[in-house]
Amino acid sequence: MTRSLRKGPFVASHLAKKVDAAVASNSNNIIKTWSRSSTILPTMVGLTIAVYNGKQHVPVYVSDQMVGHKLGEFSPTRTFRSHVKSDKKARR
């Protein structure tokens, strides 16, 4: 179910302030955030936002194809450990 158009996209207020300040000063410093549920807006295009994945901040460079998606989609929280070879020695 999508979000109501009446409400508009969700962006954490502290993140919106940091993005506005970065755009106004035209700086390309990395913006750290823990807000994975914030929606990427067109004003964020060209910025690098470090999104927390539970262990570390993963830098995400925002491009125009990412607009409308959530920040957490580009910062995976789980690492895939490949399936071990079915060897009896490996099980010991």
Curated annotation (Swiss-Prot):
Task: Provide this UniProt record's keywords sorted from A to Z.
Answer: Chloroplast, Plastid, Ribonucleoprotein, Ribosomal protein, RNA-binding, rRNA-binding
| Gene Ontology molecular function | rRNA binding; structural constituent of ribosome
Gene Ontology terms: cellular component: chloroplast; mitochondrial small ribosomal subunit
Please give the InterPro entries that the UniProt record associates with this protein: Ribosomal_uS19, Ribosomal_uS19_bac-type, Ribosomal_uS19_CS, Ribosomal_uS19_SF
PROSITE patterns, A to Z = RIBOSOMAL_S19 (PS00323)
Instruction: Please provide the Gene Ontology terms (biological process) for this protein.
Output: ribosomal small subunit assembly; translation
Q: Which family does it belong to?
A: Belongs to the universal ribosomal protein uS19 family.
Annotated HAMAP family: Ribosomal_uS19
- List the NCBIfam families: rpsS_bact
Supply the name of the protein: Small ribosomal subunit protein uS19c
Classification of source organism: Eukaryota, Cryptophyceae, Pyrenomonadales, Pyrenomonadaceae, Rhodomonas
